[in-house]
Curated annotation (Swiss-Prot):
Lineage: Bacteria, Pseudomonadati, Pseudomonadota, Betaproteobacteria, Neisseriales
Named cofactor requirement(s): Mg(2+); K(+)
Pathway as given in its UniProt record: Amino-acid biosynthesis; S-adenosyl-L-methionine biosynthesis; S-adenosyl-L-methionine from L-methionine: step 1/1
Binding site residues for Mg(2+): D17
Protein's UniProt name: S-adenosylmethionine synthase
Organism: Chromobacterium violaceum (strain ATCC 12472 / DSM 30191 / JCM 1249 / CCUG 213 / NBRC 12614 / NCIMB 9131 / NCTC 9757 / MK)
NCBIfam families tied to this protein: metK (TIGR01034)
Enzyme Commission number: 2.5.1.6
Residues the entry annotates as binding K(+): E43
Length: 389
């Protein structure tokens, strides 16, 4: 029987790029609490002892950006100079500009050539869903996220007191080529920052027993499964001291772990007038409902936009041969049941809420949090009825 391997990775909330993402989204949420129609493109850089806040923000909100950055760093767990990064001692610089009026006139309703709310930029976005896990996400990325979430949980509750905030996970699965479904886990990689007083053997055993085994389905682990725990042997220096972190540099971790294409636009720090974020969320919503409705076992949707224009320039669906009805019919159903204009997406998914901080670590998709409206499957009955299923 033919098999193939596929790998996805995740990173913890203490990874420097994720620190940057979380600061950007914390600032976005703080602004949306006071001004839900603000235009926000908040970028963050973190390095040893330094945080730089830059980008474009147009708002009536009165927000203490520097305070929010420090509070976010503290919540993540960088609260001691021994960790190489400390919310108290790091320098924070805020250098925001306002949104360009040339862009604003294309996005604001009643302005520009298209009087509807236009897209904030050109671009292409993808949504994806499959039946590999209960949340209709690919197996490797779903469980890679759960591993680093578990690492953070055990770090914060003190069960493994030598854990530090920075961590990465990676899962390689063996897939059945005939069914396209995962059969077993081939390799698990977990690297976690740690205090200098823990030896590698003790750390490795604890990580496998307390982090890896409670998370991964036991039926997917075989005697041949390889566990690579801190394979360099030491990971004391980490976080922003180990690497410079930037907003938007973990776009594959944020989405489908490489199982679906990515249009290239990052999410964190962007208000929902930016289709990089809102249309990617809508794409997930569409794809998940199509799979949940049984129209296909796998669904990938691409949407594209032109700056200042409300209607998408294209909508394409690929079901990889798993469809129960023709793809052309699925595209018709998408156009009928989902409003993919920027304003339509914002209303459909209620995106003007301060809900983005929670998205900034452990994946934007496949987490059935109450705020994550794009994970709802409330279009299933309508889709099935129109599809004749």
């Amino acid at each position: 029987m033919s098999e193939y391997l596929f790998t996805s990775e995740s990173v913890s909330e203490g990874h420097p790029d994720k620190v940057a993402d979380q600061i950007s989204d914390a600032i976005l949420d703080a602004i949306l609490r006071e001004d839900k129609h603000a235009r926000v493109a908040a970028e963050t850089l973190v390095n040893t002892g330094l945080v730089v806040l830059a980008g474009e923000i147009t708002t009536t909100a009165n927000v203490d950006y520097i305070k929010i950055a420090r509070e976010t760093i503290k919540r993540i767990g960088y609260d001691d100079s021994e960790l190489g990064f400390d919310f108290r001692g790091c320098a924070v610089m805020a250098c925001y500009d306002k949104q360009s009026p040339d862009i604003a006139q294309g996005v604001n309703e009643g302005e520009g050539l298209d009087l509807n709310q236009g897209a904030g930029d050109q671009g292409l976005m993808f949504g994806y869903a499959c039946d590999e896990t209960p949340t209709l996400m690919p197996f490797p990325i779903y469980y890679a996220h759960r591993l680093v979430q578990r690492q953070a949980e055990l770090r914060k509750d003190g069960r493994l007191p030598w854990l530090r905030p920075d961590a990465k996970s990676q899962i390689t699965c063996v897939y059945d080529a005939a069914t396209g479904l995962p059969k077993r886990i081939d390799t698990v990689v977990l690297s976690t920052q740690h205090s200098p007083d823990i030896d590698h053997k003790t750390l490795s055993e604890a990580v496998i027993e307390d982090i890896v085994k409670p998370v991964l389905p036991p039926e997917m682990i075989t005697p041949e499964t390889k566990f690579l725990i801190n394979p360099t042997g030491r990971f004391v220096i980490g976080g922003p001291m180990g690497d410079c972190g930037l907003t938007g540099r973990k776009i594959i971790v944020d989405t489908y772990g490489g199982a679906a294409p990515h249009g290239g636009g990052a999410f964190s720090g962007k208000d929902p007038s930016k289709v990089d974020r809102s249309a990617a969320y809508a794409g997930r919503y569409v794809a998940k409902n199509i799979v949940a409705a049984g129209l296909a076992r796998q669904c990938q949707i691409q949407v594209s936009y032109a700056i200042g224009v409300a209607e998408p320039t294209s909508i394409a669906v690929d079901t990889f041969g798993t469809n129960k009805i023709p793809n052309e019919k699925i595209v018709e159903l998408v156009k009928k049941h989902f409003d993919l204009r920027p304003k339509g997406i914002i209303q459909m998914l209620d995106l003007l809420r301060p809900i983005y901080g929670k998205t900034a670590a452990y994946g934007h998709f496949g987490r059935e949090e109450p705020e994550f409206s794009w994970e709802r499957t409330d279009k299933v009955e309508a889709l099935r009825a129109d599809a004749g299923l």
